[in-house]
Amino acid sequence: IGQTLVQLLSPFQCKINFFDVRNFQIDELDNFCLKNHIDIKNINQKSMNDVLVESDIISIHLPLNDETEDMINAEVLSKLKPSAVIVNTARGGIVAEEDLANFLRTHDDSFAAFDVFKEEPVINNNLFNLIS
């Protein structure tokens, strides 16, 4: 999914910083870029901390497991830019939803887009109270 997102964003010449637990070799990135007609100068593998601190948009593409449950929590959110956009189309449970609601309440320029939640169907969720 992350690679598809890169392909979709490439015509816009976006600077794409990504974090992956796997360290990609430069030739792997080069081959991916050549195959998909993407300028390799726009793609950078960085530490998770650097991605959080530097990015305008955080798009989450992770499996849900013991290591990733509530991975995006208050501590992680505190590293984001005040105007950060958070997109979660991966799995509910990766983002600590109450922590995100608190972050959004205190950062008027930020927003979040989700198509997954920890508990579905969604009956009562503090994130819905933030819709404006």
Regions found by a protein language model. Give the residues of each.
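Rossmann-like dinucleotide/phosphate-binding beta-alpha-beta segment
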Residues: I1-P82
